[in-house]
Amino acid sequence: MFGTLHTNSAQGTVNRIIDAFPGNLQDQIRTQLASTLIGVVAQTLLPRIGGGRCASYEVLVVTPGVSNLIRENKTFRINSAMQTGAKFGMQLMDDALFEHWKAERVSVEDALSKAHRPDDLAKRIVKARRGEDDDPIPVPEDE
């Protein structure tokens, strides 16, 4: 099944689905969602340098580990799982924004305006401009 929600992150989408139900049903919903959800894609559009628009995506693939996080009400750890889940096709929005900036598709200002953690993205961009390692800054588990 496909659905759309107005959220700006994969983690936010999972939380919004669960929060749509009364508190007394949320444990059951978490269990059902953990066993049925396959993935979440969050997207945003940015102005492209030179005209037009550029789509940036956050991708969550529901692996057994992510499924456990949903079931155990530990959705605050989803971003950490996504950061280490590139081999499964996962991508955080800020990583996508960084790649668009690096490829000179979007401006720094536009990338930072859509970033979930703009301070960390700004630090990463500064490091990349200096020619330093551009590895993502680890996501705190409380986000």
Give residue ranges: language-model regions.
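Short, flexible helix-loop junctions that flank or precede catalytic/ligand sites
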Residues: 1-143
